[in-house]
Amino acid sequence: MATHKLLLLPGDGIGTEVMAEVKRLIDWLNAQGIAHFETEDGLVGGAAYDADKVAITDATMAKAQASDAVIFGAVGGAKWDGVPYEARPEAGLLRLRKDLGLFANLRPAVCYPALADSSSLKREVVEGLDIMIVRELTGGVYFGEPKTITDLGNGQKRAIDTQVYDSYEIDRIARVAFDLARKRRNKVTSMEKRNVMKSGVLWNEVVTRVHAEDYKDVQLEHQLADSGGMNLVKWPKQFDVIVTDNLFGDILSDIAAMLTGSLGMLPSASLGAVDANTGKRKSMYEPVHGSAPDIAGKGLANPVAMLASFGMALRYSLDMGELADKLDAAIAAVLAKGLRTADIKSEGSTVISTSQMGEAILKEMQALHA
């Protein structure tokens, strides 16, 4: 049985509480001989700053480089608002993404049948929803230069941000999207603003070329990003895989997130390039929700997104798709029984704590392996 090396970075706030439920599941999988995980813990974010005055140490980064996957909790909180900019908690997350070369962000938006009434949209619009948004993570306007604010000397200022994409950056993210679609419902929707942005013209051109060269078996459509945002709300089940740039991906993935009813339900993955020698890629998995310091330590946090992020690691980094399917089924079964953390409570449901939710999901996993 293969040994999988995992680096666990709980971070701040509720990160430690939801990560505890992943550890509980890992311990059980190891004890049952279902899988073999070697885990190491590390500090990141505010916890790392308190200990070492940096958001992540070089030693922890070395562990991340050596791992098969990084499992990340959440960082940040008002406690660290006054720390130097380069040491702010979020800098640890950004360094992980940069140094591991994580260019592809995968954000699934899945609406469990038991939670369809928690969405702000009608049940018939969102029930059965299963979208994967593939966001380019290391290019675009967030990283382009120049990025300045200039005093014009006449009482006015000018701000400049620069949207930059090279062909290879678009090519590789497109391939991630097409490969995912082949394992799903075989459809990719590419979103950009080619009508007003040159980067959108190039994006459309490269995605179209990659499709024609290597993925003719996958259905490809193009939508302008603003129209795509409208369609995400109007008719979301038309989408399978959406691929888009950094800025639009940031916006569209948050829109898709709220179709499902709660940020506490949503996992994500960030992937690097496939190593030509090993066939593996650097990766990090994290819930979409933040550190939520206002509820930290109260047992109110929803661990589903953290557990589902571990499920994505099983599927995309550890070649354990069957086990990931069972974890997804366990989560769905718990929700179908009406068990809820406070963020997803509804009339007639039973509200339980973070640890009780983790325990309930583990019991369903045990039943599936009986």
Curated annotation (Swiss-Prot):
Keywords: Amino-acid biosynthesis, Branched-chain amino acid biosynthesis, Cytoplasm, Leucine biosynthesis, Magnesium, Manganese, Metal-binding, NAD, Oxidoreductase. NCBIfam families: leuB. One of its GO terms (molecular function) is 3-isopropylmalate dehydrogenase activity. Substrate binds at residues 97, 107, 135, 226. It is an enzyme of class 1 (oxidoreductase). Belongs to the isocitrate and isopropylmalate dehydrogenases family. LeuB type 1 subfamily. InterPro entries: IsoCit/isopropylmalate_DH_CS (IPR019818), IsoPropMal-DH-like_dom (IPR024084), Isopropylmalate_DH (IPR004429). It comes from Rhodopseudomonas palustris (strain BisB18). NAD(+) binds at residues 77-90, 290-302. Pathway: Amino-acid biosynthesis; L-leucine biosynthesis; L-leucine from 3-methyl-2-oxobutanoate: step 3/4. This is 3-isopropylmalate dehydrogenase. It holds the Pfam family Iso_dh. Its EC number is 1.1.1.85. The record marks 142, 193 as: Important for catalysis.
